[in-house]
Amino acid sequence: MRFKPYWGKDGGITISGGEPLLQIDFVIELFKKAKELGINTCIDTAGNPFTKEEPFFSKFEELMKYTDLLLLDLKEINPARHKDLTGFDNSNIIEMAKYLSEINKPVWIRHVLVPEHSDFDEDLDALGDFIDTLSNVDL
């Protein structure tokens, strides 16, 4: 709490990775305590662990009660290129982004431009079009 004056009214803690959603039980408990102390909370995630299957989804819903903001890393909107970059398709990440929009949880979308890997004009246009469908993206 000694750093709270430094944070101001909007500052707080950000949990990043690895992938914080792989430690969801810990993050829930940490964020519960943070909220008790009046600390803003943020998760920096690639979203890959997201699923609406149990037991993950009920834990994720609980975590969202204590989360003020998510930084969602969309590495590539094109599923095939996303799989080439990461080894996984992006369907669960897209599903997570849509769910966060449904519950109106504030999100910052992040995308790293890597020449010849994630900077294709058609994919950037598609990413922009997708972001336009979300009601919760904080610009």
Cite the ranges covered by each PLM segment.
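Conserved AdoMet/S-adenosylmethionine-binding subsite of the radical SAM
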Residues: 2-12, 17, 21-139
